[in-house]
Amino acid sequence: LLRCKAEMARLKHEGKAVNPDQLLFGINQGCTFADLRVEHMKQIADLDLDGYAIGGLAVGEPTEVMYEMISQVEPHMPKDKIRYLMGVGTPGNIIEAVARGVDLFDCVMPSRNARHGHLNTWSGIINIKNAKYERDERPIDPACGCPVCRNYSRAYIRHLLKADEMLGMRLTVMHNLWFYNHLMERIRDELDAGTFTAFHDRYVKLLDTRI
């Protein structure tokens, strides 16, 4: 870290520390040791970067440990900079992390799960490959307004996946990405309206439940 800070100081002095067309984030590490993470966050906060990420908590650690590390580190993150949780996660993970002060996320989960038929809905997660959807003419999620839910049935999408048709994966990925984008939109609206706590309590477990 000392070498990194020294190099950052040198680059800033030379006026070429950051590409002006991109953002530079400091990434907080420290495994599951809160004292190391807090000390590391304090030091990288001094670099005055565009944002700060919490890394190394989505590679097998228990979710409760992840939440605890976020709670420990967040008070030491600059209040006016983006807070980014790397590699997370399920809708429930996102809601819990937002409740702890996180702004930004990235994860392969919505697209990877979609390719295997695991689809997010506002009632929970469905496995569209299950036999019970073979003749189900309803959309993936009646509460969803994505192009997939407006135009295709569960039965048809299941048929595509079972037949290994590429269109099936395209449609399921489109749906899950739409769901995640709408989830983040809902979270922003609930925060603006001051109703996020009620939203959290209603959906944090429901959205990760398999139905």
Language model: regions and residue ranges:
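C-terminal extensions of enzymes
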Residues: D141-I211
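Carboxylate/His-rich catalytic cores and anion/metal-binding grooves
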Residues: L1, K5
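Glycine-rich phosphate/ribose-binding loops and adjacent secondary-structure elements
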Residues: E7, L11, G15, N19-I140
